[in-house]
Each structure stands twice: as structure tokens, then as C-alpha cells.
A protein has these predicted regions:
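Beta1-alpha1 glycine-rich phosphate/pyrophosphate-binding loop at the start
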Residues: 1-55, 136-160, 352
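Rossmann-like dinucleotide-binding cores of NAD(P)H-dependent redox enzymes
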Residues: 39, 122, 130-186, 292-297
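A conserved short coil-to-beta-strand element within the FAD-binding core of flavoproteins
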Residues: 57-68, 93, 181-191
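Conserved beta-strand-loop-beta-strand element in the redox core of flavoprotein oxidoreductases
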Residues: 64-79, 189-200
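Glycine-rich dinucleotide-binding loop and its adjacent helix/turn
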Residues: 86-142
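FAD-site-proximal beta/loop scaffold in flavoenzymes
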Residues: 99-121, 192-194, 200-278
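Mid-to-C-terminal Rossmann-like scaffold of FAD/NAD(P)H-dependent oxidoreductases
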Residues: 252-349
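Cysteine/selenocysteine-centered motifs that mediate thiol-based redox chemistry or coordinate metal-sulfur cofactors
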Residues: 363-380
Length: 380
């Protein structure tokens, strides 16, 4: 996604030179979000020939030499560049001892899972995050028996506070999904998953959705600075990497946000769309900072969930609506200013809240907590 968008943005902004787009997968570029949102695929409607983009599929980058200004491919060819944009994305975190388990990151992953759904196997999903919930939804819709195993004590523990994640626990039960929290997988055996307490779960298939890490291992020894923790490319606020003429966008790169006073690593579609536009501007001589309001969406268990912004544990939580009902929102406030918003079945809240966050608007708590009052009307 991010690589394709970079190429398109460069042409839109007037770059007339050669563009080479390397893709590790052999398939034409496609949109990743539908892979978990129903295990479908969506090819990009991009005329690469018309854009005069040299699309090289099935070519993995294995090394970078900033001194020589070359990228080495898996076949050993050193490909020269004047400017380089790193958009290698992220790779799924694997489960030790579960080599036969399915991931859900690539087109091949989706193709491998389709017959599993068609056969209506008993499925065990490891991870109750966004991807786990979305695939559990698709599996239940296909008629599969589904068990979700989560090491934390609640769904979405890494993304949302306890009081919100707990509200989502009931969604699993309503959908007929057996959610097991506070436990981990000890072994994956033919036809079964064994938990650490000895419980055996029937499993015709196992799907692992416990997160992803930036795909930056190929940059070892290149001099490109990586975050010591998450191994993301440490881009600056113009999306420049630490070596000359190199930029980084999408899931593989983190950047400093002046808006939030933190370095952000965003593994979501909207970031892979917006970041390349800024990188293209700056690569062509512009000076545009990148400081978006993060946004993503998820469809799970019959609910449309949207999130915008970036919260911190110190932010004040403000509820809009009944969280036991079909539609509600949560606002996070910092010194009265809206910093983030989660909307369940309330897309207008999200649309208005995103604009309020962008302009740094402060909210009056009383009307903001009233779901009958438009969120924008609560702005001071």
C-alpha cells in the first residue's frame, strides 16, 4: 500500500524521472485491510504502465548500501537509486512451536484460509486484538466453531483501557465465540491446541493474530537508525531516515508527533495512505511536516468500530451513550482538549471528533457526554 501510494504521489506531484517499485510478493499490489475483514482481497486500480512505473514483483530487498546508493535484491542484483523510499511494511509475530498455524497478512495467507472456512473447521484464534476479532467474525459468519485465546485478561488489552476492553468481551459471547482470556498456548498438536493449564481445544485450524513488527531486518548494517525496541525506521517529522536521500513510510517507520509529544508507529491503512504523500512532497524539495491524526476502523461482531487520535493513560475518559447499547463513543481529553475518540456505531461522532482533534479543540464535558448533542456543538 505505502509503496504504491508513494509512486502514485510522485507522479501526481510532477516527478518525471524513473520510478522502480520492488514488491516481495509475486502478486499485483492489493489492499490489505480486507484480508481480515472477511478474508477477501482488493487489487489496486492503478495503471502502473500508464504511470511509467517499473513494477518488479517477487523481488525481495535484502540489503541497503547508502554509500553506493544501491538496494540489493534476493537474486544478488544491486539496484541503484537517487532517492529511496522504504515501504517494506510489517511482518506478523509468530507463535513459537506453531509452525503449522495460519497468519493473516498476505494474499497467500487469505487463499490458504478460504478452504478452512468453507470446510467449517473448528478454529482456534490466538490473539483477541483487532485482527483476531475480525477473523473470528468472518469465521462465525462462515459457520465455523471459534475459540479465541488471549494472554491478557481482556480483549484489545494492548489498544484500549480495561474499562473499554471489558465492554467488548460480551461481543464474543453474543456471536457464539468462546473467548479464553488470561491463558496462553502451550502446544499446537494435530487437531488440537493445548493451553498452559492442560485444556485441549479442538482445532481443525489455528490462526495467529498477535501483532506485527516492522519488516526492517534487511536494513542491518546499512546505517539506517532503527528504534531499539520495535525496530521501526526512525524517521524524522519529514519522514526522512537517518541516511541521506532515504525516506521511510507506512508500517515500517515511526515518526515524531508534535501534536502528541510522542513518537508514533502506526500499523493502519490511513497512515500508509497519508505518509507517502508527505514523503513525495519532501523528496521533491518541499518542507512539509508529517503529523496526522491517526485513524483506523474495524468491523467485528456486527459492529462498526472507528478510532481517531492518540491517547495516553493520563487522559480523562468521557463516555457518550450507553456502552451496553448498540451505539456509543468514548472521548479522551487532555487539559480539556480532545486527543482521541473511539466510536462504536456512531460515525458522525468520529467524523466530527477527528476534525476537532485536528484543530486542537477543547470540549465542554457536560454536552460532550450527551449522545443527543452533536460533538461539534460541545466545542468551546
Amino acid at each position: 500500500m505505502a509503496g504504491v501510494q508513494t509512486a502514485v504521489s510522485l507522479r501526481e506531484q510532477g516527478w518525471s524521472g524513473a520510478i522502480t517499485l520492488l514488491g516481495e510478493e509475486p502478486h499485483a499490489p492489493y489492499d490489505r485491510p480486507p484480508l481480515s475483514k472477511g478474508v477477501t482481497t482488493a487489487a489496486f486500480d492503478v495503471d502502473f504502465a500508464g504511470l511509467d512505473v517499473d513494477l518488479q514483483l517477487g523481488r525481495q530487498a535484502t540489503a541497503l548500501s547508502p554509500a553506493r546508493r544501491t538496494v540489493t535484491a534476493a537474486d544478488g542484483e544491486a539496484i541503484p537509486y537517487d532517492h529511496l523510499v522504504i515501504a517494506t511494511g510489517a511482518q506478523p509475530v509468530t507463535l513459537p512451536g506453531a509452525e503449522t498455524a495460519h497468519a493473516l497478512r498476505t494474499l497467500d495467507d487469505a487463499v490458504a484460509l478460504r478452504p478452512v472456512l468453507e470446510a467449517k473447521h473448528d478454529i482456534v484464534i490466538v490473539g483477541a486484538g483487532w485482527i483476531g476479532a475480525e477473523f473470528a467474525t468472518a469465521a462465525r459468519q462462515a459457520g465455523c466453531a471459534v475459540t479465541v485465546v488471549e494472554a491478557a485478561d481482556r480483549p484489545l488489552a494492548g489498544a484500549l483501557p480495561a474499562e473499554i476492553g471489558e465492554r467488548m468481551r460480551g461481543w464474543y459471547a453474543e456471536a457464539g465465540v468462546d473467548l479464553r482470556t488470561g491463558t496462553t498456548v502451550a502446544a499446537v498438536e494435530p487437531g488440537a491446541v493445548v493451553l498452559v493449564d492442560g485444556t485441549r481445544l479442538p482445532a481443525g485450524a489455528v490462526v495467529v493474530g498477535v501483532g506485527a513488527r516492522p519488516a526492517t531486518g534487511w536494513l542491518a548494517g546499512s546505517g539506517v537508525a532503527l528504534d531499539p525496541g520495535d525496530r521501526s525506521v526512525l524517521a524524522d517529522d519529514r519522514l526522512r531516515a537517518s541516511v541521506p536521500q532515504v525516506y521511510a513510510v507506512g508500517d515500517c517507520a515511526s515518526f515524531p508527533s508534535a501534536r502528541y509529544g510522542a513518537r508514533l508507529l502506526i500499523h493502519h491503512w490511513d497512515n500508509a495512505l497519508q505518509g507517502p504523500r508527505t514523503a513525495a512532497v519532501n523528496l521533491l524539495g518541499g518542507d512539509e511536516p508529517y503529523d496526522p491524526v491517526p485513524y483506523f476502523w474495524s468491523e467485528q461482531f456486527g459492529r462498526f468500530v472507528q478510532y481517531a487520535g492518540h491517547r495516553s493513560p493520563a487522559d480523562t475518559v468521557l463516555w457518550r451513550g450507553d456502552p451496553d447499547g448498540p451505539a456509543w463513543s468514548v472521548c479522551w481529553l487532555r487539559d480539556g482538549a480532545l486527543t482521541a475518540l473511539l466510536a462504536v456505531g456512531r460515525p458522525r461522532d468520529l467524523a466530527q471528533g477527528r476534525k476537532l482533534i485536528e484543530r486542537g479543540a477543547r470540549l465542554d464535558p457536560a454536552p460532550a457526554a450527551d449522545p443527543a448533542v452533536p460533538l461539534r456543538a460541545a466545542a468551546r
